[in-house]
């Protein structure tokens, strides 16, 4: 039977994809995304924004509940567990980034861990069930972004995870819970009415809510569809539907499942080595290279007093152009700050964005010397952008270095061991060593897991009586910096 609309072809894909459609490459890449998302989520549970959203969410209760990651004695209704865990994943802007531009995992993974725990079934949810639903949620996001030329660039008007992430969440939940094709279509339609958040809230405590809301609202859309709520049957076909988010929206029917090719097989994600906007990673890479001209065995400190001018040649991305950031969230979205901190310190780490680091007098003085240039051959795309840094000394000497690809970008991916080390450094903030290592083992063999409760039990973290043991084991980790990556 011919499918009648783009919307129905999406519902058909969500409903029709099976475990045997998963390729070895898809399983491998998605397990890396899951491990990284869990790690940055555990780290994010220590942030101020996470504390605020958990305090808010405590007013809700339900007969069914799910784990808040790393909090064994704190459970929430599944929609709110997905919300706060999604906020945790994006609370420090440390989560994965895709092309076209979005953060794909944070709106999907918290939904699936919450559902697998809150709605047990027979047979039980398996690791393959989770991997399939996760990849369906990622695939829907990617397919939607490919309908717009605008989506290929770094966003200017709205934050993509708040839009495509909401539909990815609904798709993943619909697949996980086995909804019919018709119910999958309704879940997408309902999710569109929950979607969207302006990019103006980037660099604030509100930005992480975009991911949390996408997770929560996609799950809500799925529950409402299960209860029979209906929406526009052509929501993805219409300029007044999903096309309202894009000026140049041009949707197309999806290929048949017989010829299905996963977008993640064709386009990997980027993993970050420090918690800041992805575009700043090119800046840090170029700054580290130019610093080698100025910091030598004979001169161990960066000669800030000798600097006349620092020029950054980068794309024109207004919300990452912050000459004098006043907060950790602004610093994470500042080309200028990341350049100066990299030059002064030699590397960027989690504490680089603490307020006392951001407001150092040496940093503020160096920021005054930074100028931005936007070369016409450097458009704002995570696939093609570059950063060139030129430093001119007061004696007229100039040093220039350029980064086209940083370590962690999909063209230069993190090794599996470095990804594990990032996870260890992040997750050890909340978990004892044994739990950290057990999670690595479980995620890396997720396709063999017969019961997802093995995973969700580990996500709870230590019980109260285990706290002393946890604190003892944490003493062997360095929590102030991420491990030095071996392939840089």
Curated annotation (Swiss-Prot):
Tissue and organ expression note: Expressed in LPS-tolerized macrophages (at protein level). Expressed in the luminal epithelial cells of pregnant uterus. Expressed in microglia and macrophage cells.
Keywords assigned: Antimicrobial, Immunity, Inflammatory response, Innate immunity, Lyase, Mitochondrion
pH dependence per the entry: Optimum pH is 7.0.
Cellular component GO terms held in the UniProt record: mitochondrion
Sequence similarity: Belongs to the PrpD family.
PANTHER family: 2-METHYLCITRATE DEHYDRATASE-RELATED, CIS-ACONITATE DECARBOXYLASE
Protein name in the entry: Cis-aconitate decarboxylase
Organism: Mus musculus (Mouse)
């Amino acid at each position: 039977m011919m499918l009648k609309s783009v919307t129905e072809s999406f519902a058909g894909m969500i409903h029709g994809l099976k475990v045997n459609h998963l390729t070895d490459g898809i399983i491998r890449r998605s397990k890396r995304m899951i491990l990284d998302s869990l790690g940055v989520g555990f780290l994010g549970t220590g942030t101020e924004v996470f504390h605020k959203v958990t305090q808010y969410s405590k007013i809700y209760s339900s007969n069914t509940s799910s784990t808040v990651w790393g909090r064994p004695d704190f459970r929430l209704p599944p929609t709110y567990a997905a919300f706060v865990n999604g906020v945790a994943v994006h609370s420090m802007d440390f989560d994965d980034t895709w092309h076209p531009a979005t953060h794909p995992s944070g709106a999907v993974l918290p939904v699936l861990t919450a559902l697998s725990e809150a709605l047990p079934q027979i047979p039980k949810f398996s690791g393959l069930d989770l991997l399939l639903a996760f990849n369906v949620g990622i695939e829907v996001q990617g397919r939607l972004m490919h309908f717009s030329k605008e989506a290929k660039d770094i966003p200017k008007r709205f934050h993509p995870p708040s839009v495509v992430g909401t539909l990815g969440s609904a798709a993943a939940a619909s697949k996980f819970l086995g909804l019919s094709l018709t119910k999958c279509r309704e879940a997408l339609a309902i999710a569109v009415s929950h979607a969207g958040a302006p990019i103006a809230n980037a660099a604030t405590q509100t930005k992480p809510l975009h991911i949390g809301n996408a997770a929560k609202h996609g799950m809500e859309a799925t529950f409402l569809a299960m209860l029979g709520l209906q929406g526009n049957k052509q929501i993805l076909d219409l300029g007044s539907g999903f096309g309202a988010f894009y000026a140049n929206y041009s949707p197309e029917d999806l290929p048949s499942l017989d010829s299905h090719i996963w977008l993640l097989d064709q386009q990997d994600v980027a993993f970050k080595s420090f918690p800041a906007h992805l575009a700043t990673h090119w800046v840090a890479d170029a700054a580290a290279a130019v610093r080698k001209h100025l910091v030598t065995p004979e001169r161990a400190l960066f000669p800030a007093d000798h600097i006349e001018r620092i020029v950054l040649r980068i794309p024109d991305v207004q919300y990452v152009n912050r000459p004098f950031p006043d907060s950790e969230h602004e610093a994470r979205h500042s080309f200028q700050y990341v350049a100066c901190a990299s030059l002064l310190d030699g590397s960027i780490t989690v504490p680089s964005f603490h307020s006392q680091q951001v407001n150092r007098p040496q940093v503020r003085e160096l920021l005054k010397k930074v100028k931005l240039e936007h070369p016409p051959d450097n458009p704002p795309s995570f696939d093609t952008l570059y950063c060139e840094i030129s430093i001119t000394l007061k004696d007229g000497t100039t040093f220039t270095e350029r980064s086209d690809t940083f370590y962690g970008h999909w063209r230069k991916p993190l090794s599996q061991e470095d990804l594990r080390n990032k996870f260890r450094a992040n997750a050890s903030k909340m978990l004892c060593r044994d739990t950290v290592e057990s999670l690595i083992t479980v995620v890396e063999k997720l396709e063999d897991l017969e019961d997802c409760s093995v995973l969700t039990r580990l996500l709870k973290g230590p019980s109260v009586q285990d706290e002393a043991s946890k604190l003892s084991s944490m003493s062997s980790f360095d929590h102030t910096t991420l491990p030095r990556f071996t392939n840089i």
